[in-house]
Amino acid sequence: MKKVMATGTFDLLHPGHGIYLNEAKKLGGEDAKLYVVIARDSTVEKRKRYPIVGEQQRLELIKMIKGVDEAYLGNENGDFLKIVEEINPDIIAIGADQRHDITKLQKAINKRGLKAKVERVKAYHNAELDSSCKIIKKIKKMDFKGKINDNCD
């Protein structure tokens, strides 16, 4: 059984997230276990923007996805390799649209004496709303014409 680790923000879930996680698990073969690490709010703020959905809710949502065996919040101190040491995966799956330098990451993993092999997932869901950013932009542009429920807090 191979352990596959996938990472991400997973803010405003969309089909691209599901495809990434399914393809990540396939990298480990038929009996693979998928471990998903969700970026902390503080990490997301530093790298992208303030998350819409908080880290605890994002963790709960990922745990509900079929095919995810275990899910964890990442480390707040910025040491990504600490969670890699804890999970000790055989494969770290990088999403098709994630901006990671695979060679640099593999060198850092090797330097720490870890066995994980870094692989990029090739499949990508190309659609109108295939990123959280696109979803946010669409919502900002929409004119709801007063049709938002007033009971919404």
Curated annotation (Swiss-Prot):
InterPro entries: Archaeal_FAD_synthase, Cyt_trans-like, FAD_synth_RibL, Rossmann-like_a/b/a_fold
Matching Gene3D superfamilies: HUPs
Record-listed ATP binding positions: T9, F10, H14, P15, G16, H17, D97, Y124
Molecular function terms from GO: ATP binding; FMN adenylyltransferase activity
Pathway the protein contributes to: Cofactor biosynthesis; FAD biosynthesis; FAD from FMN: step 1/1
Reactions listed under catalytic activity: FMN + ATP + H(+) = FAD + diphosphate
SUPFAM superfamilies: Nucleotidylyl transferase
Cofactor entry: a divalent metal cation
EC number, as in UniProt: 2.7.7.2
GO BP: FAD biosynthetic process; FMN metabolic process
Domain of life: Archaea
Chain's role: Catalyzes the transfer of the AMP portion of ATP to flavin mononucleotide (FMN) to produce flavin adenine dinucleotide (FAD) coenzyme.
Similarity section: Belongs to the archaeal FAD synthase family.
UniProt-listed PANTHER family: FAD SYNTHASE
Oligomeric form and interacting partners: Homodimer.
Name under which the protein is recorded: FAD synthase
Species of provenance: Methanobrevibacter smithii (strain ATCC 35061 / DSM 861 / OCM 144 / PS)
Organism taxonomic ancestry: Archaea, Methanobacteriati, Methanobacteriota, Methanomada group, Methanobacteria
